[in-house]
UniProtKB/Swiss-Prot annotation:
Annotated EC: 6.3.1.21
GO terms under cellular component: cytosol
Name assigned to this protein: Formate-dependent phosphoribosylglycinamide formyltransferase
Pathway: Purine metabolism; IMP biosynthesis via de novo pathway; N(2)-formyl-N(1)-(5-phospho-D-ribosyl)glycinamide from N(1)-(5-phospho-D-ribosyl)glycinamide (formate route): step 1/1
Residues annotated as signal peptide: none
Occurrences of domain ATP-grasp (ranges): 119-308
One example of a Gene Ontology biological process annotation: 'de novo' IMP biosynthetic process
Pfam family, one: RS_preATP-grasp-like
Protein family per UniProt: Belongs to the PurK/PurT family.
Positions with a binding annotation for Mg(2+): E267, E279
Encoding gene (name): purT
Summary of subunit composition and partner proteins: Homodimer.
UniProt keyword Iron-sulfur present: no
Source superkingdom: Bacteria
């Protein structure tokens, strides 16, 4: 039984979002629909989720003392991380003191570090992954590359959105790749993972919900990546029944091993009937924004329902749908969007995130579309995104 209090009243149910970007904004909206009091926290003011929260705080979330202070002040019933760059040691301490971290502090800590989740998947669970080695010095990096072989990929163990990643084809690239990885790590210089290149037909995100009534799966989401970030996603991604079964088995093993209730974005490589584990996020996934138009319950609604202890039941997928990002390049603290009227229409929607500024390339919105098939849906979403003119 789930008891929910009313926001801003003494018995309010309080949810604190650690990370207030576009994904957190949608989680906040789902909480608001249930009358929950929302507190949004991020490292910069006026972040998207702060626009729809009851209160907000600006702190360095890697600062454990600052994180503990704001949590102690607000006394949330649920702490919901939206990003990886958080003082997870502090979250584990707070969870040990009785606070509820979504899905659990262990999952948040393991997945913020590629080494933690890779060792769990490959070495503890025995799941198929790419070949890999870890390195914490330039000399051991060279040894790792020699062991894995060319071509290979190097990534900081703590980074996101492609930061610090390089595709290495020859020894001449090693020095530059090492330096780039040291610059791109979330917590500064440090360990890297060297991965062998996996031959695959396509990548999917399998949105997997662990709830009081068991583990549930959304239809697989296909996506296209460029420069470490997704550009388009679509649902459902066509794949063989055997590959889908294997993908679901891998996802089930991973989310149950991580523990807790919530939605997980499980990233997988698919080659024919073979499926290889890549990564997992213990929270809604950017490629899953397509579910805002493709399902009766979006990934955000599913996440909230699960961590509140409510049953998920069946997930209804409406049919072929796609998302395409609005990704301008400019510098402005007063962004405007023109021609939006030409982007929307029957079966086509636009979401603008409300980010306060841009300095370079930044994802500021997403177009969503349905279609007779996923190919048509992708075309419609891309066309809608291209029609939005971003100025500043």
């Amino acid at each position: 039984m789930t008891l929910l209090g009313t926001a801003l009243r003494p018995a309010a149910t309080r949810v604190m979002l650690l990370g207030a970007g576009e994904l957190g904004k949608e989680v906040a909206i789902e909480c608001q629909r249930l009358g929950i009091e929302v507190i949004a926290v991020d490292r910069y003011p006026d972040a998207p989720a702060m626009h729809v929260a009851h209160r907000s705080h600006v702190i360095n979330m890697l600062d454990g003392e600052a994180l503990r202070h704001v949590i102690t002040e607000e006394k949330p019933h649920y702490i919901v991380p939206e990003i990886e760059a958080i003082a997870t040691d502090t979250l584990r301490e707070l969870e040990g003191e009785g606070l509820n971290v979504v899905p659990c502090a262990r999952a948040t800590q393991l997945t913020m570090n590629r080494e933690g989740i890779r060792r769990l998947a490959a070495e503890e669970l025995g799941l198929p992954t790419s070949t890999y080695r870890f390195a914490d010095s330039e000399a051991s990096f060279h040894d790792a590359v020699a062991a894995v072989g060319f071509p290979c990929i190097v990534k900081p163990v703590m980074s996101s959105s492609g930061k610090g990643q390089s595709f290495i084809r020859s020894a001449e690239q090693l020095a530059q790749a090492w330096e780039y990885a040291q610059q791109g790590g979330r917590a500064g210089a440090g360990r890297v993972i060297v991965e062998g290149v996996v031959k695959f037909d396509f990548e999917i995100t399998l949105l997997t919900v662990s709830a009081v009534d068991g583990v549930h799966f959304c239809a697989p989401v296909g996506h296209r990546q460029q420069d470490g970030d997704y550009r388009e996603s679509w649902q459902p991604q066509q794949m063989s029944e055997l590959a889908l079964k294997r993908a679901q088995e891998i996802a089930r093993h991973v989310v149950l091993a991580l523990g807790g209730h919530g939605l997980f974005g499980v990233e997988l490589f698919v080659c024919g009937d073979e499926v290889i584990f890549s990564e997992v996020s213990p929270r809604p996934h950017d490629t899953g924004m397509v579910t805002l138009i493709s399902q009766d319950l979006s990934e955000f609604a599913l996440h909230v329902r699960a961590f509140l202890g409510m049953p998920v039941g069946a997930i209804r997928q409406y049919g072929p749908a796609a998302s395409a990002v609005i990704l301008p390049q400019l510098t402005s603290q007063n962004v405007t969007f023109d021609n939006v009227h030409a982007a929307v229409g029957a079966g086509v929607q636009v979401r603008l995130f409300g980010k306060p500024e841009i300095d370079g390339t930044r994802r500021l919105g997403v177009a969503l579309a349905t279609g007779e098939n996923v190919e048509e849906a992708v075309i419609r979403a891309k066309k809608a995104a291209s029609r939005v003119t971003v100025k500043g």
